[in-house]
From Swiss-Prot:
This is Na(+)-translocating NADH-quinone reductase subunit B. It comes from the Bacteria. Its cofactor is FMN. The keyword Cell membrane applies. Belongs to the NqrB/RnfD family. The gene is nqrB. The chain crosses the membrane at residues 56-76, 121-141, 164-184, 195-212, 237-257, 265-285, 287-307, 312-332, 348-368, 371-391. One of its GO terms (cellular component) is plasma membrane. Its main location: membrane. One of its GO terms (molecular function) is oxidoreductase activity, acting on NAD(P)H, quinone or similar compound as acceptor.
Length: 403
């Protein structure tokens, strides 16, 4: 193997005393990404497993691909659909993305290639900036602390990118991922020591620091000078009837043929990747079930209460399921094993808390039509407390048993 031989040849330069000793973390990251780690356990009586942390993170990264590829197509489709109905908007477009799309494809909404290229012209730069800037911080902290670079950043980078609208400026992408990696993870010691989901920390920073680029009706479509509302915004204004009258059926929302963040629109694509996470037991099914229980119970309760002034009270649970970032947050964000509850009972409570909070924010709080991000971050804050009470209750039960 040419690559293996090359890596072995230059390895001594990165070891202790070598010319590039301080960059050993970067060398080790490339080496272990391409090949299995050289260090193995040689003592007896060890449990062997078919997956390690690196393979687990790579699998989570791969599970985002259905949502990623569909998101790129849908981003282009939504833009080309608008161009088809508004030729004057197409003539008024400019910029390097528009020129690149015109050189490689066209602007036909019925063309799979045209839509995919248009969407890729928006998503891939976002992902590239996220990976490069976030990777810089990962390498910097790993070099200073003299430890390996963890593959968890593969997951953080793609999750952060998929939660963003296509029109976000790239410099804001760099700001968001920097805040998420440095403040959300590294200041607490790095991978495994953070108590908040770093991808959501970065998005929350952008949401509050630059709300004009993360909310409203003008950010969800890759078309300059066009404003289009998401399903949740339409529901907040006119209920489910308002969503349907705007041309978005429940099936459209389930498939993801609507405006929204790049990777959060298609519940079907998210379920495909999420099913793999659940089958491989990377994602905790108790958390997913808990989120669903909390969401269904509270949304049904609001349906029974009703309201003459707030149409969101009448929004049924199956619309909450396909609207906004609920599916993506449930399967990819809430199930983060580091920032979620660790006890089995705690996972149920953690999930139910998130399900209740997301409906509460969506229905009652008029300032935030989408509540999944805030609900999960609130759940992250409560996770240690939940586990504490679960452990203490178990200790008391054991002590009472021995009395």
């Amino acid at each position: 193997m040419v690559i293996r031989a090359f890596l072995d040849k230059i390895e001594h330069n990165f070891e202790k005393g070598g010319r590039f000793e301080k960059w050993y973390a970067l060398y080790e990251a490339v080496d272990t990404f391409l090949y299995r780690p050289a260090s193995v356990t040689k003592t007896t009586a060890h449990v062997r497993d078919g997956i390690d942390l690196k393979r687990m993170m790579i699998l989570v990264w791969l599970c985002t691909f259905p949502a990623m590829f569909f998101g790129m197509w849908n981003t282009g489709y939504q833009a080309n659909l608008i161009f088809a109905g508004n030729p004057e908007l197409l003539a008024a477009q400019g910029g390097w993305r528009f020129a690149l799309t015109g050189a490689l494809a066209g602007f036909d909404p019925n063309s799979l290639w045209d839509c995919f290229v248009q969407g890729a012209a928006y998503f891939l730069p976002i992902y590239a900036v996220t990976f490069i800037v976030g990777g810089f911080w990962e390498v910097l902290f790993a070099s200073v602390r003299k430890h390996e670079i963890n593959e968890g950043f593969f997951v953080t980078s793609v999750l952060f990118s998929l939660t963003l609208p296509p029109s976000i400026p790239l410099w804001q992408v760099a700001m968001g991922i920097s805040f998420g990696v440095v403040i959300g993870k590294e200041v607490f010691g790095g991978t495994g020591k953070n108590f908040l989901n770093p991808a959501l920390v970065g998005r929350a920073f952008l949401f509050f620091a630059y709300p004009a680029q993360l909310s409203g009706d003008g950010v969800w479509t890759a078309v300059d000078g066009y404003a289009g509302a998401t399903a949740l915004s339409l529901a907040a204004a006119g209920g489910v009837e308002g969503v349907v009258s705007a041309g978005v059926s429940w099936m459209d929302a389930f498939l993801g043929i609507e405006q929204g963040s790049i990777g959060e629109t298609s519940t079907l694509a998210i379920l495909i990747g999420g099913a793999v996470l659940l089958l491989t037991k990377i994602a905790a099914w108790r958390i997913v079930a808990g989120v669903m229980v909390g969401m269904v119970v509270l949304s049904s309760l609001f349906n029974l209460i009703g309201s003459d002034t707030n149409p969101m009270f009448a929004m049924p649970w199956y619309w909450h399921l396909v609207a906004g970032g609920f599916a993506f947050g449930t399967l990819f964000m809430a199930t983060d094993p580091v920032s979620a509850s660790m006890t089995n009972t705690g996972k149920w409570a953690f999930g139910i808390l998130i399900g209740v909070m997301v409906v509460l924010i969506r229905v009652v709080n008029p300032a935030f039509p989408e509540g999944m991000m805030l609900a999960i971050l609130f759940g992250n804050l409560c996770a240690p407390l939940i586990d504490h009470f679960v452990v203490q209750a178990n200790i008391k039960r054991r002590l009472a048993r021995n009395v």
